[in-house]
Amino acid sequence: MTLHAILVTLIVPPPNLILVAILGFVLLRRSPRLARWLLGGALAGMLALSLPAVAQGLLVPLEWGLPRAPPPGAPPQAVVILSAEVDHVRGPGEQVRLGPLTLQRLVAGVALARRTALPVLVSGGRVGGKHVTPIAVLMADAMRDTFGLPPRWVEARSKTTWQNAEFSAAILKPQGITSVWVVTDAWHERRALLAFRHFGLTATPAPVEWDVDAGGWLPGARAWTVSYFAFHEWIGWVDYRLRAWLAGPPPAIAASNKAA
C-alpha cells in the first residue's frame, strides 16, 4: 500500500474517528477537558455517520449538477465501464470474482452499449497479487459469456480512477475516439469525469443510481458504508482537482492548445 493510500485510509471514517478517540484517551490525565471533548466528538461522529439521513446528506451532493446529455457537437463514440470491487473466493491460490458494484456497472454499461450500438472499453487492473486476474479481464469474460457482447478494448493495468482515465485515453485516442460515456456509480462520476477530462476525453456521465433510505434516523451498518463512500469520494475529488492543477494538461493536450 502506498503512502498516499495509507493517508487516505486514515482520514476517512471510521479510522479518523478512532484516531480521535485514541488521542482523547491519551490526554485524559494531561488535559481532561480536551480529552472529554475528543471522546465525545468521536462518539457523536460515529453515531451520526450511522444514520441513513446523514449518510445521504453527504452522498447526494456528489451527484448534483451532473450533465445528463452529451455536449453539442461531441457525441460519444464509445462506452467506458469502470470497475469497482471484487469478492475474494475461497480456494487454492488467489481467486476473485466480480463484486456487486462492479456487476451493477457492467449491467448498466451493457444496456447502454446495446441502446447506442457503441463499442465498449472495460477498465480495471489487479486487486491483489500478481497472479490475480485483473478486474477488466473478469468483466470482459462476463460480457462475452453472460451478455454475448464482448468489449472491443480491455484496459487491465489501472489501479485507481486516475489511471482508469489515463490508460483508457491512451487506448482510445489513437483510435480517433475523443468522446465517451463513462459508466460508474453516480457518487463516483464527479471524480471520474474530472480525471477523464484531464486526459483529453470529452466525458459524459452514465451514472448507476444507488438507492439510499432518505428518511431513516435509525443507526445501521449500510449507512456507515454510504458515509465511508461519501467521505472517500469528497477527499478523492479534492485530491484529483489538486493533482490536475499541479500537473497541468498532459503533453499532447498542452501541445495542441499551443498550436491552436
Per-region residue spans from a language model:
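A structural signal for short, hydrophobic/glycine-enriched beta-strand patches
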Residues: P52, Q56-W224
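Hydrophobic membrane-insertion alpha-helices, especially the h-region
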Residues: W37-P52
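Hydrophobic alpha-helical transmembrane segments
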Residues: L7, L19-V20, W37-G40, A230
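Membrane-interface helix-boundary motifs at transmembrane edges
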Residues: L28-R36
